[in-house]
């Protein structure tokens, strides 16, 4: 499918505690339908219902979709796996392209000026990146909040409880939005293989092998 044919996009993100699904018009970023459920332990369970509800809000069906955009993190292993596997499955089943984007870019790309973006990385750490007028200049990375260098940032966006750890004004957006995800795509490029941004080893530990 050529770039000019892509009009209606399914955007999903499971890199944060929010399970986000939305239907977006590519050319003007108008959100036709959106559902968000905040539940860090139910990404897999909530994503499909949210996708179907967003389609219903937009009065569309799966057959009306031209592309899928998915946030590839950084984020926890289990959450990312749910969103990226679903995006790949939708693309394969519908025969449409799937584009992966940095979830932090879906937040930072909607900011102006010098902005720090942070999201929850668990283990008392944050995923972060710095932006200047919506363009990422540093990151993504994962650190304890105290070890994050805000640099020239004049504001902080992202997870409110973690943004509050910095001596900076908090601004929106607080999570990746469907419009932000679609805006983060370079539509001039061909879709590339989806690569998750874990930035560290999964929390789950392998079981010991009995001998």
Swiss-Prot record:
Keywords: Signal. InterPro entries: ATPase_NBD, Gcp-like_dom, T6A_TsaB. GO terms for cellular component: cytosol; peptidoglycan-based cell wall. GO terms for biological process: tRNA threonylcarbamoyladenosine modification. The keyword Signal applies. To M.leprae ML0378. This is Uncharacterized protein Rv3421c.
